[in-house]
Amino acid sequence: RLGVSHFRAPPDYRKFEFFLQGQKNLDLKIPFLRFPTWHRCMKCKMLYKPSRGLHIRDIGTCKRKYDSKECNGTLVQVPFVMFCQSGHIEDFPWNEWVHRNHKPICDGKNLKYEDDPHKSGGLDSIYITCLSCSKKGQLPVRRNLKNITSSSKNNESTELTENLEKNFKFKCRGAKTWLGYGVNE
């Protein structure tokens, strides 16, 4: 049970018209934040995170350039977030995960989200690749999402902590995403 006595629907939108001057709720808009903020392009498969949130009018097509042409693929939200027992919620740390480092040197602006068609369709079939590190002559930095929803063997931490860096415990940052981007306790 949710422990609530009732639910309420938001008021309908009523555009201001001169003849409706006495009406209530004219031009009333409901504020919202788009979350998760990470998106992926369905065409080029690149991950995209805007620097300061996304407005609904900004969503739509990928603006990455390939051979001087825009990709124009459809952007969709990535369906993974992190939350803790205290109710904090934030975007999954894609850059930290793929680099296995809580403070990666790479900026994470060239991460690719790919599905392996030869696997079952579970988390182990989703791969994140850092194309920036791969271009620098390093071995490709690539990692799948296997076990990201699992607890560690001792149930005292998460798979994220166990597989990020040795001797580093990935802790909740206290994010209160519902209050705005970058709001933490």
Where are the regions a protein language model picked out?
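Extended, Lys/Arg-rich, non-catalytic nucleic-acid recognition/anchoring regions
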Residues: 1-185
